[in-house]
Amino acid sequence: TDMFGLHQSMTDDYAPNQVASDYMGVSETLMIFTPIRFYWENKKEILKNCLFVKDGPLSLRATLAKLSAPIRRFFDYAKSKGIDVAMIGQEKSGQFFDHLQLIGNSAPVGSCFIPDNKYIQEKIKHNNTTAVYGADTNYGAKLFIKINDYHKMVINIPTGHRGEFVTSPSQTNLINFKNIIASLPKILSNKFEGALLPIELANKIASLSTYPSAKTLELFADAKKGT
């Protein structure tokens, strides 16, 4: 069953690019929660020693947001059971990343900034609305972090509650905040500015230019040239 309604924007002979993007977003989310579910059902204690890293925000747009509420409930439930599941999502593009470029250079090294709803709407989204940003779509709070002059980043950390991350932003509301911040310097990559090694390695594996698939495409292209 297409619970997200992806088929509604499709016709018999056409599907917009957004369908593929939405499908990928759901797939990535389900994939990162697969090991979490496995350990939760078999050995919860292992989750205390794990950090799950997602390439992109902890957010699901439009109809995909149906998943955000149960995800928030899971994080809250796990915390109530004494299991603080550590997860981050790193944003490398978009309005929050663009804003980081404006404020990052003047921010002190070792600083962390959690914007509230007013700041997000006025300074980043440039809206006049008082609506709570991401209350239905996000399952993580946005943070601007400057570890050093080379590593400045926008990351998301779950809170387990709807909208709390912008109406009353606080480090205490961020699940496993201290352990996450302590772990970040250990997984930095110096290959790219603001890069995290797990994401860099994942993107490297997915790159066609790195693995045999690139050679396959090259052979296919050469064969076509000869015909």
Residue ranges of predicted features:
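Long, contiguous domain-sized segments
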Residues: D2-T227
